[in-house]
């Protein structure tokens, strides 16, 4: 795959047909899967490739907790926690205060205030995804990884959520990789993208200008 260099505030979309390795790439960069081979991987000042080579699981877990934020296609909310507690979970795990100005701004921007005391089962799919977006940025990670965040939504709500997510990334100065099968949605925002192409025995990621 081509070399990736993401500046703070930059967003790169990864597109392609189902089953072509988009999510696998995201999970590998998110340190959820171990790569079969790896050249360089740096996240800010951290040499992730060296940590992987040393199999330093403690350090890798710390990177996942502090430097990475995830938005899963399913939302991934814990069903036994209310919305407010789901959002604050990454901060609690790091020993951070539940009070955060940027989290409150994100809650307001995504219109989640009336939902904070509800359990995930009481929310619509779109509402759960909005909660997942706020949770992913609650601890101000360096890199946001979003796997098909709009896949279960109708076109109107998909566009609205995508716009809100990009707004949060811009405001907080994060880097973001967003996997999407919706080329038209990605294109409408003018995002640079990698397109995953299935080839015999491999997946190739091609830069699309």
Segments (PLM) and residue ranges:
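Conserved ABC ATPase signature
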Residues: 119-129
